Amino acid sequence: MIDTFVIFYKTSNYNTKDVLSLPGVIRELTRKDFDGNLRLCVKPSLFIKKYSSTESSNNKVLCNLKEALLVKDYFDKKIGEIGELRRVDFAYDTEIHFNENQKLNKFFISMLLASRNSSLNKIFFFFSNNTSLNMKIKNKTMEFSIYNCNDKDRLGNTRYEQRFTSLRGLDNFQNKILKSLNKYDKELCDLTSTIPVIETYFSELIYNEYQMSKNKYKNLHEFIAKMDASNFILTKNVFKQFFEKISDGNVDFYIKNFRRKRKDALKFITKLEMETLIKKIRIAIDKTK
């Protein structure tokens, strides 16, 4: 569903203070540039809350495309100009807390990087700080974030947010947004095909770390505990590929023994869990159209 959009107006006649008083406007992100052009950042759901008397909309924090475009029309008429839609933020919220789902989140955003032909070497930089409550990737046309939102007025505790930032032009806003949503949906549909790439990458990442730093650890058990706590052992296959490089032992026996000594350790993400997350986001995309 749609959370936020940014509209660009060339007018310099409208008072910025009047704009800031309009419902749904995000004050801290709305501004005029040196030429007097107005960059208006709006949460359409806040506008809908203001002007709708229905109980369902009083709890509304996201809206569909039709509702968002009606809100844009309101601002166009109020300002007296057809604004250029510069950015639209699509969001899916889940009740699961961010810290409880870090492996799945890391896996998901890694798959997006792979599908967008971005360097997976960015992953180690992004997630080396295990306390981070935000995972983000971006390029010239889009931004994607997974972040903690339990301190905000949201439908859940973790948000998966895709920002479409290449919507410039004064016409066919609906078609442009639909095209972007369909492209994102197609990407999600094909996303699980990147799983082997991600698993190989992380198994090699762990192996290289082991080769460089094994003298820092008392034993293999301690090293694996560190990698597991850092959320690098995403799936059983990641662990298996690494383990078979450094040991002739039985991988299933080792996992069972490791879990016996460390409660809640080596919890692997399954393909079904990933497919379930993807399905839920795709359903949200469909509801947005």
Language-model-derived ranges and their functions:
Residues 1-246, 269-289:
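Structured, helix-rich domain cores that form ligand/interaction pockets
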Residues 241-263:
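Helix-turn-helix DNA-binding segment
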Residues 257-275:
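Short, solvent-exposed alpha-helical "recognition" segments
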